[in-house]
Amino acid sequence: MQVMPPTPGGGPSRLFILRPVATTLFMIAILLAGIIGYRALPVSALPEVDYPTIQVVTLYPGASPDVVTSSITAPLERQFGQMSGLKQMASQSSGGASVITLQFQLTLPLDVAEQEVQAAINAATNLLPSDLPYPPIYNKVNPADPPILTLAVTATAIPMTQVEDMVETRIAQKISQVTGVGLVTLSGGQRPAVRVKLNAPAVAALGLDSETIRTAISNANVNSAKGSLDGPTRSVTLSANDQMKSAEEYRDLIIAYQNGAPIRLQDVATIEQGAENNKLAAWANTQSAIVLNIQRQPGVNVIATADSIREMLPELIKSLPKSVDVKVLTDRTSTIRASVNDVQFELLLAIALVVMVIYLFLRNAAATIIPSIAVPLSLVGTFAAMYFLGFSINNLTLMALTIATGFVVDDAIVVIENISRYIEKGEKPLDAALKGAGEIGFTIISLTFSLIAVLIPLLFMEDIVGRLFREFAVTLAVAILISAVVSLTLTPMMCARMLSYESLRKQNRLSRASEKFFDWVIAHYAVALKKVLNHPWLTLSVAFSTLVLTVILYLLIPKGFFPLQDNGLIQGTLEAPQSVSFSNMAERQQQVAAIILKDPAVESLTSFVGVDGTNATLNNGRLQINLKPLSERDDRIPQIITRLQESVSGVPGIKLYLQPVQDLTIDTQLSRTQYQFTLQATSLEELSTWVPKLVNELQQKAPFQDVTSDWQDQGLVAFVNVDRDSASRLGITMAAIDNALYNAFGQRLISTIYTQSNQYRVVLEHDVQATPGLAAFNDIRLTGSDGKGVPLNSIATIEERFGPLSINHLNQFPSATVSFNLAQGYSLGEAVAAVTLAEKEIQLPADITTRFQGSTLAFQAALGSTLWLIIAAIVAMYIVLGVLYESFIHPITILSTLPTAGVGALLALMLTGNELDVIAIIGIILLIGIVKKNAIMMIDFALAAERDQGMTPYDAIYQACLLRFRPILMTTLAALFGALPLMLSTGVGAELRQPLGVCMVGGLIVSQVLTLFTTPVIYLLFDKLARNTRGKNRHRDEDIDSSELLNGQEPQ
């Protein structure tokens, strides 16, 4: 058994210094755990901060927005409104579709929310229309979340209806089964159907009406149980030719007899194989296509989900005919991977820069290797904790590790520098390691816990911003904690074995030059410090000025929520006049697509028109524009958007709204622009008055561009005004009139064709091409009580009116959403203030409430908590420092350095044109933790000099400043160079990382210059105040040896 040497000291590091094998194995265990954790960690763009969101879609073809609202949306909303944990409920009722989006509290598991939604739908079933062709369908997906993958399916020799059928059964269903997939939508879906187009004059001439024909078709196509025959020895199942599965079979269907002669369906109608909804269309570039948009469930690993889909895609494509082409047009994971790879490169670059700084200061290869090992060990070990905490490798956690490179090396540098000082005095390396580590142990603990204290308030933040902060803060805190452990264990052990007097005194040309340079800097610093200490009030004035300037800059700097990212993907909405027809809208959509594809930065696009669960009105078209990689284009996304809008502005009668796709999606509805706020009222009439006024007012204000709203009440409505008395006299009911209209103009789904793999519909309508426009109403015939035909225009008049294209609700009340983008040079904070001002200027009534949505709402919450967050961080750090130093005064001296960091960070943000956003706030909070390190190192040594050497406070702080100048400069430069790659990043997602780097670099430069002078002056000021109030002896008793307290000893 090894005998422990009698060398005293070492503190908590003693055991590790004397047991090098155990220490090495302990570090190897941390390294292996980190490597295993890294390999198991998922990859994503950002921490998972999605609200549990479920979308409920109910289709009712032919129904007006009013009918959809009252008969479908309202009954469902009443049931959904009773669910616990519901945060927000938004609905959109348009012609033929009801879409309800349910957003739940962050704490509610998505599976629990799903169960509640299913129960609510079941409870509302009896209240829904009896002729509803499809039941409500819910999907665990946020409709505002852009698809993770977009596939375009085109064909040359096969009808698109047949292609759609194959894609739905062979591809879409299989992809929907992949873990993490929330919804697969088929835009432009030409789902096969048998279309029956009635010839109204022929129907009237034969004395028939559409209801008779509908009933005949429904009765002729059935698929029901028929039973079986069970004899003495055999059992026989009954079957029949009760189904008709093709247009040819329907043509010969006998629907009535006249004078003994059969009337077949083909006598009064055109029957064809067509699409279930012929008012849907999609294109890949300019070619007709079926577009598959694959959306993820909230909270899943997007990379793993996309990889699973891509792995199975080749096998799925093999099941399709060779003439069918499937292309992946959009893959959001490619930019996520590129962004993460860029951050990983910046992390390695930061490590290299930090090692370079260490070598320049230590001027010794052996001394450089020791902290160089501490950096990767601390970072890799963090991955193990991240795995057990359920984190992912994402931009924020990698940014935390990049910043940590400058933090984790600090502790090792302080330990090495202190041990080296004793070795250079001639002590043996082992004795120097024990003495130096024991002496510096309390400082390391102070630095670590005070820095972690800064991050504690971040853990208590709620909502989206809190989730974002939490993963960043915990990752950084773990890295710092592991760094402290490494610095108190591995670092002094390696110093004892690798450093020697000869190696430290050995010099080369670089070391001699740097030695002279640092001696010159310290000499000039000593002269400047003397002057500053002799003119304390001037220095205090400067310190106070930095505090005032920090407040002024905070008030002046533009404020935002999240940096605008260039992910190479743009979402677009094309808006046409509200009365536009489907064919006209499709033509305009293709015209715009052709213009966009000419732009040199555009690689491809998909576009879609029609009404379904993703698009509420016919006058809106959707676009998804894929840009070329950053390396292949000259401009960033804001410039490209401006250029595209200018190019399209020459197309008459349309307005194009564009917004870049972001990794962070908080909204629950797909909007035309980036930012939204909602107006709520008790009636639609109030909204119709005030929404246009507010939109018009905002359009005049400077911070806004692309101001619009989803309030559309100028759609053309053909109002059928029935003379009820005349209809009753003829034995015609309102139900019969509604049925006749629905049969003629509603693309009514009247029967179902069942096959082994799918179900198809029979669609009934009038052949409107024969009699276009309102004249088609003249062909409508009904059957009176005497069996004779009655023209609809004999009992009703047709009036053309204006009406809503869609009716929106927010939490069951009528609502309208106003959307806007920011004008060049304006911040989100300025826009929010301008909205509030506009409401006052137009004198918006009190019974109309406004509420910001999505990222704008999150911005308000973040802005409101920013100041309190910084105050909480300062208070937490004061408490920790007060406990460690057993003093009320010294923590104030240390915290006096903070305004210098704030000034530097805010100035840097303003000079580089960045806003004060969530990422910048993280940087400022981290600066609070970094900058106080300078003061801690000064004050620790000053207190020790006063206590152990009997120095005066003046001499003690003066010597502490000179003695700790090099480690202070070294640790500051290490942190600065650790942040430098983030500030200078240019790759994918650089917009997200730059504000953090700018804050860190700017704050460190300014604080480094100022705190070297302000801290000693403030130290002497508080020392003088303490002596004047309590007396000299009492003051000396209060300066307790903190390291003795830590070891359980009584103070001397």
From Swiss-Prot:
GO molecular function list: xenobiotic transmembrane transporter activity
Q: How does it sit in the membrane?
A: Multi-pass membrane protein
- Entry's SUPFAM superfamilies? Multidrug efflux transporter AcrB pore domain, PN1, PN2, PC1 and PC2 subdomains, Multidrug efflux transporter AcrB TolC docking domain, DN and DC subdomains, Multidrug efflux transporter AcrB transmembrane domain
Q: Which GO terms describe its cellular component?
A: plasma membrane
Q: What is its main location?
A: membrane
Claim: Transport is one of the keywords in the record: yes
Spell out the subcellular localization from the entry: Cell inner membrane
Family statement drawn from the similarity comment of this UniProt entry: Belongs to the resistance-nodulation-cell division (RND) (TC 2.A.6) family. MdtB subfamily.
* Self-association and partners: Part of a tripartite efflux system composed of MdtA, MdtB and MdtC. MdtB forms a heteromultimer with MdtC.
NCBIfam families assigned: PRK10503.1, RND_permease_2
Supply the name of the protein: Multidrug resistance protein MdtB
- Give the species this sequence originates from: Yersinia pseudotuberculosis serotype I (strain IP32953)
